[in-house]
Design a protein with these regions (language model features):
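TRNA-recognition modules of translation machinery and tRNA-sensing kinases, especially anticodon-binding
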Residues: 1-263
């Protein structure tokens, strides 16, 4: 809380369950969260509801419903800390009930905000004493860049269609960028040789990404540009990032925080 308040973020509390449509439309129909991991139920009013699997969609819904975009000074800076639920195979570091801390900035397209959010994550991890902090960043570009890159990916992956897992086969036409997030070992060599989105950004997207990097340099944040990062949710554009750190008992670098812009 102290770090967020230093950056003038205010706490927001959202419901533990929301209308299922919020996550289907907001998080993305092709995301693993929606297709495999949500806890869905029908309430007594015959409404389809979902236990929240992540925090962003509920915050954005609250921003719109409460008209925070109206007379309030922009951007609106919020942070949350709450329980999330995902139906996935329990394993080390992954539980079906988890606590997620996050920050959201709404009402600004300034690349400085991207760097600020990354800086908050790094400062929180430093404050709690984590070592070996590593920041990986990438740009997914604007819609024009992603549409062009989508065509390139379909052309690249099509010859390998019979070698890919079933999930990737389904993603090829719907959202080929999601193929790059595949965790199946047999697909890894195909992914490594795939075209990189950073080579297909248009001038505006490339310039924006360069500005984010300059802001990170000014904030003295060490980072690596990693074109393989696409994140697992469908709403991201432009900057995406992952923050790794050493965690006692795990013995290796672990991704503890991640996020990105969603214009």
């Amino acid at each position: 809380d102290a770090v967020c308040e230093r950056y003038n973020y205010e706490f927001i509390r959202t419901p533990i369950f929301e209308a299922s449509e919020l996550y289907h439309r907001g998080v993305g129909e092709t995301s693993d969260i929606v297709t495999k991991e949500t806890y869905d139920f029908t309430d007594r009013g015959e409404r389809k509801m979902t236990l929240r699997p992540e925090g962003t969609a509920g915050v954005v819904r609250s921003y719109i419903e409460n008209k925070m975009y109206g007379d309030a000074k922009q951007p609106i800076k919020l942070y949350y800390n709450g329980t999330m639920y995902r139906y996935e195979r329990p394993q080390s570091g992954r539980d079906r009930e988890l606590t997620q801390f996050g920050v959201e900035v709404l009402g600004s397209d300034d690349p400085m905000i991207d760097a600020e959010v990354i800086s908050i994550a790094v400062n929180i991890y430093k404050m709690v004493g984590l070592k070996g902090i590593k920041v990986n960043i990438n740009s997914l570009g604007d819609k024009e860049s992603r549409d062009n890159y989508r065509k390139i990916l379909i052309e690249y992956f099509t010859p390998y269609i019979n070698e890919m897992c079933d999930d990737c086969k389904n993603r090829l036409e719907k959202n080929p960028l999601r193929i790059l997030d595949c965790k199946v070992d047999g697909d890894s060599n195909i992914m490594k040789k795939a075209p990189k989105i950073t080579d297909y950004l248009n001038d505006a997207s490339r310039e924006r990404f360069e500005r984010v990097q300059k802001y990170l340099d000014l904030l003295d944040i060490d980072y690596v540009v990693n074109p393989s990062i696409v994140r697992g949710l469908d709403y991201y554009d432009h900057t995406v990032f992952e923050v790794e750190a050493m965690v006692e008992g795990f013995g290796s670098q672990n991704v503890l925080g991640a996020g990105g812009r969603y214009n």
